[in-house]
Regions:
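Negatively charged, low-complexity tracts enriched in Asp/Glu with abundant Ser/Thr
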Residues: 1-41, 57-79, 83, 91, ...
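Short beta-strand micro-motifs enriched in acidic
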Residues: 45-47
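Hydrophobic residues embedded in beta-strands of well-ordered beta-sheets
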Residues: 51-52
Length: 95
């Protein structure tokens, strides 16, 4: 079985951001050079030897664990991300 890398997961998250019309970067620099959070952005979060999918809150004041799985292995998160994409595609087909 091929190793799941951080780059693999980043590519999947980029796909999710594009599918949902959300910003691809979690933060961008404004005219004053300060970082501004990008509401709606999906991104990876690493802690406790694992990884999870977070989304920036609407006001850019924090994040939440989208999949509510906590920090899991890269392989497990890859499976969860593919399931998440399947769910997005089902909703798109409904419209």
């Amino acid at each position: 079985m091929k190793r799941v890398t951080e780059k693999d997961l980043e590519n999947i998250v980029t796909r999710i951001n594009r599918m949902t019309g959300n910003p691809e970067m979690a933060y961008v620099r404004n005219a004053e050079g300060k970082l501004e959070p990008q509401a709606g952005n999906y991104h990876l979060s690493f802690a406790y030897g694992g990884v999870t999918l977070h989304q920036m809150c609407d006001e850019g004041t924090g994040t939440h664990d989208v999949l509510r799985c906590g920090y899991v292995s890269k392989r497990e998160l890859q499976s969860l991300l593919f399931a998440f994409i399947d769910g997005i595609q089902v909703e798109v087909k409904k419209d």
